[in-house]
Curated annotation (Swiss-Prot):
The keyword Signal does not apply. This is Large ribosomal subunit protein uL16c. SUPFAM superfamilies: Ribosomal protein L16p/L10e. PROSITE patterns: RIBOSOMAL_L16_1, RIBOSOMAL_L16_2. It holds the Pfam family Ribosomal_L16. Part of the 50S ribosomal subunit. It is found in: Plastid, Chloroplast.
Length: 140
């Protein structure tokens, strides 16, 4: 699973996900992509589940890119712990995804196969997504 090799600080504030994504909202590497339609935290496990699905389809001559990276630590406290005594320890990592962000890209496969792969990968995500192609973006 994806996680940073080292970070400057062990714990982070939760933050908020206002507005739309201004970075990472265009197709850069492949011809087909999966785009987020709502903001959410996507865990490293969910990213990995989507990657496995797409990799299975792209294996036959295709290439895929993961455009998000889980760099935010989420802390949790042990079960049945009283309030107070500081913040919990980091348990897992998430990627902060805003509306419009590209999650995955794929190239080297037919549009039909790419759409099938992205549809299954979309079911692994906790948000609504849409399948987009490079031609859709350039034509309008």
């Amino acid at each position: 699973m994806l996680s940073p090799k080292r970070t400057r600080f062990r714990k982070q504030h939760r933050g908020r996900m206002k507005g739309v994504s201004t970075r990472g909202n265009r197709i850069c590497f492949g011809k087909f992509a999966l785009q987020a339609l709502e903001p959410a935290w996507i865990t490293a496990r969910q990213i990995e589940a989507g990657r496995r699905v797409i990799a299975r389809y792209a294996r036959r001559g295709g290439k895929m890119w993961i455009r998000i990276f889980p760099d935010k630590p989420i802390t949790m406290r042990p079960a049945e712990t009283r309030m107070g005594s500081g913040k919990g320890s980091p348990e897992y990592w998430v990627a902060v995804v805003k509306k419009g962000r590209i999650l995955y890209e794929i190239n080297g496969v037919s549009e039909k196969m790419a759409q099938a792969a992205m549809k299954i990968a979309a079911h692994k995500m906790p948000i609504h997504t849409k399948f987009i192609t490079l031609s859709q973006l350039t034509n309008g």
